[in-house]
Structures are given as structure tokens and as C-alpha cells.
């Protein structure tokens, strides 16, 4: 994103004009939906049949991950739990896109496969749903619709911010998704849409802005929590002393 911004800025300075165009298929929506539905259901069923209990136990552990640091689910939990997680995430995104009226074409299917691929290293249902909901919420309040081509891609690729939801909770995940929807739809102006990874760049901008704010708020909350804990300890000690339950160890002054 930074490189594209610099290059496009230089080109504009020399009078070079870059025209953008939109190629967006809307005629094969049902075919794309049913194809993805069959694929992801097959992934889930095969992993359950072959892995059985191991699959479910591993998937349960995957859901406990925050997603930070690109954890390798294949190494930590094995093949079947990871494949099951990929199927679950792909199925969830496919259903969400379908019921929101989104299109299934090259860009959207490719974006869903991107989500599925990264489901082997960090993403799972618990940390992607909050950021997705943030984009859906934004679509009901802002001037654009989730069915718009650029908004549809943002809805899928906002999962780049899944670690924020995994680490800091559902509330901050929704906020991250809400902010990302605006940044991703406007940051492309900097490089005239020439950056393929527009949502990745926008996600980085949102993370750089939001994470320090979250940490600052949490740091301010820590002293109060520590104070409350110390106050509880002192109250317990005073209560024990009043009841004369505090006993000195024997032979502390003499043998």
C-alpha cells in the first residue's frame, strides 16, 4: 500500500492518468453459492469422519486461540481440526454473504478462499464474527450498502483484523470492523485502486490507530483493579484481626 501510494503519487505528478474499471459478475450467484456450500460441507464431514473425537477436541482448542502471532494450527492441533476449522469459517462466510444478498463471482470467491486459507493460521469463528458484524452494522448506518462490490469484499476481508477481537474481546472487534469499513472504502484513493491488497493495507492502518488506544484504556483500568484487589486484602485482614483470628506462630520470641 505504501509503495503503491508513492508510485501513483509520482505518476500523477507527471500528468499520468490512471483509469479504473469494474468487472463484476452477477449472473452466477446461485452456482457459486451451492458450489462453495458443497465444498465446505465436504471439508467438515470428511474431517469429522476421519478425525472423529480428535477433530472436535482440537477444534475446541482452536477456538481458545486469540489469533495473534500467526499460530500454526496444523502443527499445534493436527490436520483434521484445522481442516474442520477451515470448513466452518468458509461455510459461515458463504452463508453470511448469501443471506445479505451479496454476489458470488471471482473476487468474492477468491476472498472467501483467502479467509479459508488463513483459517489454518489464526482465524476461527470466535474472532472473525465480531469484525464481520462491525462491517454489517456500518452498512446499516453509513451511506453505502453491503451489497456494493467494494463493500462486499470489505465484508469478507475485514477478517484481517480478527486478532483484535481474539485478544481484546467482542466489543473491540466490532469497533475494528466498523472503522475498517470506512478506511477500506476510502484509502484506495491514495493509489487509484492499483493495490490488490487494499483491505490488508486498510487493516494495517486501523490496527495502528486502534490498538494503542485499546492498550491505553486497559492500562488506565489496571491500577484501579490493583487498588480494588489490595483493598479487599486489607479488609479481610482487618476482619480477621477484629475476630482475633490472627495467631502468632509458636516460639517466635522464645524457645
Regions found by a protein language model. Name each.
Residues 96-147, 156:
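Conserved mixed alpha/beta catalytic, RNA-binding, or beta-rich assembly cores of soluble enzyme
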